């Protein structure tokens, strides 16, 4: 049977947006086993939600829908208004500032709970720092990153 992940994702998202009363333009692009979906329209803040939680939830659901019928695993990345890149920059900046604080106060800093993707951004941002190290603790979905002196 002809399986088209882009079409599956689009059909699902159109139904969701229709139910929400939102008019959203959906642009999909598939590269290998990755499906990138960019959403444009008014009120995209509603789709982003607090710290991207709504966008993450929607991405999770699209992932389930696409992979239900896919013969191989497809990674789905949902974005709007360049939110993912902006969030990455915010998290990197936060990581650098908190690392400074740890060096100055010599006390650990525990960040708010984050999803694995966001925790990875923090770990990557500080991996080459000679004075601090990072690790994750806690149980999903409430795992947080701890920044500590080496």
Regions found by a protein language model. Name each.
Residues 1-150:
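RNA-contacting regions in translation and RNA-metabolism proteins
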């Amino acid at each position: 049977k002809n399986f088209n992940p882009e079409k599956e994702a689009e059909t699902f998202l159109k139904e969701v947006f229709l139910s929400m009363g939102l008019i959203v333009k959906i642009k999909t692009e598939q590269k290998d086993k990755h499906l990138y979906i960019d959403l444009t329209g008014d009120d995209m803040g509603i789709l982003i939600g607090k710290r991207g939680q709504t966008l993450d939830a929607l991405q999770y659901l699209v992932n389930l829908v696409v992979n239900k019928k896919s013969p191989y695993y497809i990674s789905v990345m949902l974005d709007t208004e360049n939110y993912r890149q902006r969030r990455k920059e915010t998290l990197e900046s936060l990581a650098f500032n908190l690392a400074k604080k740890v060096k100055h106060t010599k006390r650990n800093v525990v960040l708010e709970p984050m999803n694995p993707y966001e925790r990875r951004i923090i770990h990557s941002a500080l991996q080459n720092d000679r004075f601090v190290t990072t690790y994750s603790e806690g149980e999903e979905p409430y795992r947080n990153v701890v920044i500590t002196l080496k």
